[in-house]
Amino acid sequence: MGIIKDRFKAKADIASAEIKSIIKDHGNKKVGEVTLAQIYQGMRGITGLVTETSLLDAQEGIRFRGYSIPELQDKLPKAPNGGEPLPEGLFYLMLMNELPTEEQANHITSVWQRRSHVPNHVFATIDALPLSTHPMTMFVVGVMALQTESNFAKQYANGMNKKDYWDATYDDAMDLIARLPRIAAYIYRRKYRNNEHIQPNGLLDWAGNFAHMMGYDDESFKELMRLYMTIHADHEGGNVSAHTTHLVGSALSDPFLSYAAGMNGLAGPLHGLANQEVIKWIFEMQEQLGTDSPTKEQIAQYVQDTLNAGKVVPGYGHAVLRKTDPRFSAQMEFGKKHMPDDKLVNTVWNIYETVPPILQSLGKIKNPWPNVDAHSGALLVHYGFVEYEFYTVLFAVSRALGVMASLCWDRALGSPLERPKSVTTESVKLWLEGKDQIWE
């Protein structure tokens, strides 16, 4: 086995023993109550999952293994002459529950480089789709075509011992993450750049190489990709893409199938399209106002008109967070460093100063602050990356880091098949009348 794989197994064995002890000693303790409203309304607020890689703090935002976004920007290794964290370092942290050294992060880079070869049939499968196909559809089809390379599926078919599930899952996860930038970049160049492809550069890191293969060799764009891939990598386990990947994986579907399922969830408008909606809203505002540099007063009036029309301001509000999303702040700092005079970016900042007070004045909104989606699109547009449909693919490549690290832990800890109980409305009515005990 490899160095990282050996250390991961040792850590997982310790964690597994600890969890078994917790369940043995405290398994009957209740962790909360569930209301009928929660059951009917998306199970929001119900604690029903364990995800080791990240936890959402209402005040500090997402914490990866206990570290906030600002702490990660300070402590994670960076590319030579770079200022943003390497996603390889974040993956190591989520997998190993410890901060990596520069050497360890670079080792992940080299492992992914060695595993990055994509078989020709994957590209042929993508090429068989009409050019008009949505890039997320192409992406998921590409991942499904890559499933032929699954170590887990082959070993399971040959009678693999369940104690070895984690090993094959780890190999699949590393292969999948390594190959995603190649698949995504191929789709980008096929759909938007006349099918003129760029070969990978084996000297670049994972995110830098992704930028290169898409055709962006500006060093600051590579930095943006490193930041983007880091801050979008994980967001607890209850969101649609993470939960779906975990759920499908619990049936012992291999990591390729599980990840593809999760990304079909990410493609949904309520999950992965938010940054597109933000850019669309800003462009509509600029067009209606007849200026690409609206004043704060003009923005305030447009926001009021949006709200009066019964619409929401995209990019603002969060189900849990009660302050400005630190992922927004990280992107804002990137903008100040690399594009302080960009008109669209400055408009995003003016919206940031304008919207929260208006939302607060309504008195109905717990969180009037911007989330991660309020800023990311404007940074991409600065570099001429205006293929908005592809933004979700960027999100998908990033999210692989978190869901694959979690899937490795699921199999290493022997997580069982997920199978919650469901009820009918008729049985609920009988229960309310005291005629049925559906909760027993």
Report each predicted region and the residues it spans.
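Hydrophobic alpha-helical bundle cores within soluble ligand-binding/oligomerization subdomains
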Residues: 1-440
